[in-house]
């Protein structure tokens, strides 16, 4: 059975190699790749702009920005044991982009993270949405035609995107796993700064919480009541759980 599955995978890869060509290697710099270096409260981040770029994701561990059949180092990620590994381990080298391509005219901002962004509230609020704040340091959001998000199935995802005014421009990576755009934009991870997921989650940048508060908590009455929202983060076997009170 295993041999049969492997043969099937090899056939699928050859088919997509024929359609889109094999992934050759990786690239850091090019005339079509711009990298902006910014700081938010002494934290360093990169913003990546790639012209005529494909984005492929398996929706869980790997996302590849692909320019001329090369993976762009920086915005691409390949999570192994919760840590972003070498770009050489990206799944597209082994399996290619095993989904048919969808073309979007215009600029796309990728808000993709690991599989946690698909359904986990914490990862949505702290991994996905803060990338908007990072990008705003250099790019006017009005110039972005589409926002590629992990998922759109849950109410909290729809609600937060509506409050940010970008819901109608949002597309789900669950539906569109392989896309092409005139320009693809990505960022560094908002809070994964080291090779220790446990350390990073215990030292979340304060600006993320302040940004979330400024965007989503509005006091309707200054006299009568205050709405309090508490996030309790627990580390259990390197898994982040969220409780609301």
Predicted regions and their residues:
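The feature primarily captures lumenal catalytic ectodomains
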Residues: 1-245
